[in-house]
């Protein structure tokens, strides 16, 4: 729906900070209700990210495949009658079973190959993030225009929640359909967060607490569906880049030591709180999930299938995601962008042609964004670092859950407690890192580097088990289940800091007026890289039969972004972004002038 601007006599109009930049722009001051609408979606989807993707989905996929799999050497079923791990009554519930076949791989046949059941989960998530990257590229750039921002957010939220709920119908014989649901759910999750991120600069820009310069805003104009500008789209005047360093440049490695801008401070505060609230919701649902698992273990349900209790948990997660998405639907304003012309001058365009044109526009818009980004050194360096860092984060998360389940032989209940530990730590980290950063005067990139250094502890500690003396002891190096819990605290604290700081730090470098397009590039970089790590670890598992071998890949991967983050200069990046906006504006003005002169020449010749 189209959101009408406030009437001139309304209280909201009196608080309006700036005039609209294009016809139909909603410049209503951001309200607390609207911010809570933004928070609500994080509360909704973070539950699926943590409880689903982060813990129970990998376990469910692995267990579904395991119940159809056989041991590689003996060819006996991994679960069920005749299995070495089967209990006296012929069943082996997933939440209670500890495999006795210590030195044999459980494999499942797929496409003519025997795949380790743990690798099956890793490969599924690699495919999921690949599809996710293609999807968000195709749709998220459209969020800058009309009401697409909110429409896409709700569509991804409702479809994603449905996939989680549908898991209750996935039995072991159709475990491949479970992989399909994972691909759809993960795709919707990541794509929706991209659109959610694009709301953040808009909410900050319209917040009453942000003081605006007393100058007229540049008008934003429509863009044609073929990706060409009808008129320059820019929100900053030329004086922005000529006025010297931007005050927001507190987070770089340059010489600036000035305070952060009000916009960056507010953006970081909202972002950090959003991450923290999401973690709070995830902890609550995780506790409910463990309670549900424990209750079902006392019934005959777990004897029907070892995955059935897990599938009930995913049903609960899907219901939660759907419910809070409804809150976002009610409270978050659409904040429409400039119009995107889809009509043909010859008449009504067929619907499928309109969508093809829009998807083509999205890819063309991304390509234009890439061409702009490669001219912005600080953006390019940060994206290179983010490519490596996001791959490391995704790989560690997936590997840790499967490591706990297959190497440490932890029950599903203990894995759930492990996830709660990491989530609580992540919640603390989201609120703690801004305090630490202010207390010690750390710039944003220095805070990110500190998080990365702590993150490196995880794979290094896991590799200690290869040292003969520790291996002989049977402890140290993640050889005992209790050892993984302190590392879960480290993982949570680090992830909480990286999630909020990387998102807000990148927002500082974005050319004004291109928030959704650049956050699409940010997410495409994230998801594009996250295809690589899990797939490589999956191949290592297939080759060695051990999840632990993945640490040899993860350890150097985590360290590689540090020098890149160090050299990012936020002050310079902000100036480059504003200067790029000016060049684009001048280029579009020249193009429009040439088109006008050509038209006048044709008219003069009577054509």
Swiss-Prot record:
Transmembrane segments: 41-61, 119-139, 151-170, 188-208, 274-294, 307-327, 379-399, 415-435, 450-470, 485-507, 519-541, 550-570
Protein name: Autophagy-related protein 22-2
Membrane topology qualifier: Multi-pass membrane protein
Alphabetical list of Gene3D superfamilies matching this protein: MFS general substrate transporter like domains (1.20.1250.20)
Membership in a protein family: Belongs to the ATG22 family.
Key word Transferase present: no
Entry superkingdom: Eukaryota
CDD domains to which the protein is assigned, alphabetical: MFS_Atg22_like
Gene Ontology terms, MF aspect: transmembrane transporter activity
Region named Disordered: 1-29, 235-263, 586-607
InterPro entries with a match to the protein in the record: Atg22 (IPR044738), Atg22-like (IPR024671), ATG22/LtaA_families (IPR050495), MFS_dom (IPR020846), MFS_trans_sf (IPR036259)
Keywords tagged on the record: Amino-acid transport, Autophagy, Glycoprotein, Membrane, Transmembrane, Transmembrane helix, Transport, Vacuole
Biased composition (Low complexity): 247-263
Residues carrying sugar: 89, 445
A single GO BP: autophagy
Gene encoding the protein: atg22-2
Name of a matching Pfam family: ATG22
Chief localization: membrane
This protein's GO CC annotations: vacuolar membrane
Function as written in the Swiss-Prot or TrEMBL entry: Vacuolar effluxer which mediate the efflux of amino acids resulting from autophagic degradation. The release of autophagic amino acids allows the maintenance of protein synthesis and viability during nitrogen starvation.
Compartment(s) where it occurs, according to its Swiss-Prot or TrEMBL record: Vacuole membrane
Organism: Aspergillus oryzae (strain ATCC 42149 / RIB 40)
SUPFAM superfamilies, sorted: MFS general substrate transporter (SSF103473)
């Amino acid at each position: 729906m189209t959101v009408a601007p406030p009437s001139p006599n309304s209280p909201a109009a009196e608080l309006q900070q700036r005039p609209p930049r294009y016809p139909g722009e909603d410049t209503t001051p951001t309200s607390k209700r609207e911010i809570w609408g933004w928070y609500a979606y994080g509360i909704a989807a973070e539950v699926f990210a943590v409880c689903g993707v982060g813990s129970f989905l990998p376990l469910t996929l692995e267990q579904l495949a395991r119940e159809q799999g056989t041991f590689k050497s003996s060819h006996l079923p991994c679960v069920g009658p005749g299995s070495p791990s089967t209990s006296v009554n012929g069943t082996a519930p997933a939440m209670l079973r500890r495999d006795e076949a210590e030195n044999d791989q459980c494999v499942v046949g797929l496409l003519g190959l025997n795949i380790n059941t743990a690798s099956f989960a890793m490969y599924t998530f690699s495919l999921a993030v690949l599809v996710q990257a293609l999807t968000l590229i195709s749709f998220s750039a459209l969020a800058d225009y009309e009401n697409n921002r909110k429409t896409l957010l709700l569509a991804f939220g409702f479809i994603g929640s449905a996939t989680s709920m549908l898991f209750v119908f996935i039995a072991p014989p159709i475990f491949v359909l479970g992989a399909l649901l994972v691909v759809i759910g993960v795709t919707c999750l990541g794509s929706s967060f991209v659109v959610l991120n694009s709301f953040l600069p808009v909410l900050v820009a319209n917040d009453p607490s942000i003081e605006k310069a007393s100058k007229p805003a540049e008008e934003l104009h429509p863009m044609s569906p073929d990706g060409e500008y009808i008129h320059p789209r820019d929100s900053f005047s030329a004086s922005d880049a000529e006025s010297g360093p931007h005050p927001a440049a507190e987070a770089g490695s340059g010489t600036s030591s000035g305070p952060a801008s009000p916009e960056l401070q507010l953006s970081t505060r909202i972002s950090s709180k959003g991450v923290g609230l999401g973690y709070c919701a995830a902890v609550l649902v995780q506790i409910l999930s463990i309670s549900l698992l424990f209750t079902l273990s006392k019934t005959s349900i777990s004897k029907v299938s070892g995955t059935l209790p897990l599938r009930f948990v995913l049903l609960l997660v899907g219901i939660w995601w759907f419910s809070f998405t409804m809150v976002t639907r009610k409270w978050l304003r659409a904040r429409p962008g400039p119009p995107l012309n889809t009509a043909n001058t010859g008449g009504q365009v067929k619907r499928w042609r309109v969508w093809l044109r829009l998807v083509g526009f999205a890819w063309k818009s991304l390509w234009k964004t890439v061409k702009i980004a490669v001219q912005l050194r600080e953006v390019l360096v940060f994206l290179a670092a983010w490519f490596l860092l996001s791959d490391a984060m995704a790989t560690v998360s997936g590997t840790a859950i499967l490591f706990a389940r297959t190497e440490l032989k932890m029950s599903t209940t203990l894995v759930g407690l492990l996830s709660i530990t990491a989530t609580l730590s992540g919640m603390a980290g989201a609120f703690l890192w801004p305090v630490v950063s202010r207390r010690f005067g750390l710039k944003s990139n220095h805070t990110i580097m500190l998080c990365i250094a702590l993150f490196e502890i995880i794979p290094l500690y896991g590799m200690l088990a290869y040292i003969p003396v520790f291996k002989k002891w049977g402890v140290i190096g993640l050889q005992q289940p209790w050892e993984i819990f302190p590392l879960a605290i480290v993982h949570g604290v680090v992830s909480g800091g990286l999630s909020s700081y990387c998102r807000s730090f990148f927002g500082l470098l974005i050319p004004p007026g291109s928030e959704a397009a650049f956050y699409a590039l940010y997410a495409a970089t994230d998801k594009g890289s996250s295809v690589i790590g899990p797939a490589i670890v999956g191949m290592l598992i297939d080759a060695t039969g051990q999840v632990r071998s993945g640490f040899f890949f993860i350890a150097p991967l985590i360290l590689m972004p540090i020098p890149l983050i160090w050299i990012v200069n936020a002050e310079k990046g902000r100036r480059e972004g504003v200067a790029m906006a000016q060049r684009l504006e001048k280029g579009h003005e020249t193009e429009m002038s040439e088109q006008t002169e050509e038209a006048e020449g044709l008219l003069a010749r009577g054509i």
